[in-house]
Amino acid sequence: MQLEKLQKKLGHQFTNLDYLKQALTHRSAAAFNNERLEFLGDSILNFAIGKALYEKFPKSNEGELSRMRATLVKEQTLAVVARQVELGDYLKLGAGELKSGGFRRESILSDCVEALIAAIYLDAGIDVALARVYQWYQELLEQIKPGEAQKDPKTRLQEFLQGHRLKLPEYEVIEIKGDAHNQSFRVSCKVETLTDVVFGQGTSRRKAEQHAAQQAIEKLKIK
């Protein structure tokens, strides 16, 4: 019954439920997990969003289209999509992940969305998979528009500092916690015009640096 409810939320009734079950299974729970589906779903999602943006913004250049796509397929956005269907309630996690609140973790939720896209593709074909992506992303695609806000925090911070002829920020990993498959990075970011060092956290060094850059942007009040 639980999976029946989820399928209604997703807008797709699976012919082969094994695809859905695999998409919901995190690597901490079983060897037969969603990692391969996630790989395939990532490619389908990038194509789907790229196609939608190409058609919606005929005057936008490659850089603007790439930045908008990055905004729509990033971890935080995928986690928003996951929460719309309360995906965390249906995840199959190992005991450790369950205890640490893995069903709320953005990285796990976002990976599962990508896996679900692949599962729908394998179950019903590319047209159905694309239709579901556009259904889930309808509001986000309506709201997105070209502009500075689409640039990632590190790029925005760097361009601001270069524009004011200031030194580039210095990032340094100061702490790594957790097992290899579930690491958390803490990064410091030194900016010439800020008296205090800012910090960021994330499931990878890159994400932690982006988070730290965002903290610097907010302190510098960069628009």
UniProtKB/Swiss-Prot annotation:
Q: What SUPFAM superfamilies does the annotation carry?
A: dsRNA-binding domain-like, RNase III domain-like
Q: Where in the cell is it found?
A: Cytoplasm
E.C. numbers: 3.1.26.3
Biological process GO annotation list? mRNA processing; regulation of gene expression; rRNA processing; tRNA processing
A cellular component term (GO) from this record?
cytoplasm
The DRBM domain is annotated at 152-222
Q: Please name the catalytic residues of this protein.
A: D42, E114
| Key words of the record | Cytoplasm, Endonuclease, Hydrolase, Magnesium, Metal-binding, mRNA processing, Nuclease, RNA-binding, rRNA processing, rRNA-binding, tRNA processing
GO MF term list: double-stranded RNA binding; metal ion binding; ribonuclease III activity; rRNA binding
Q: Where is the RNase III domain?
A: 3-125
UniProt-listed InterPro entries: dsRBD_dom (IPR014720), RNase_III (IPR011907), RNase_III_dom (IPR000999), RNase_III_sf (IPR036389)
Q: What PANTHER family does the database record attribute to this sequence? A: RIBONUCLEASE 3 (PTHR11207:SF0), RIBONUCLEASE III (PTHR11207)
Q: Which family does it belong to?
A: Belongs to the ribonuclease III family.
What is this protein's name? Ribonuclease 3
Native species of this protein?
A: Histophilus somni (strain 2336) (Haemophilus somnus)
Gene name of the record:
rnc
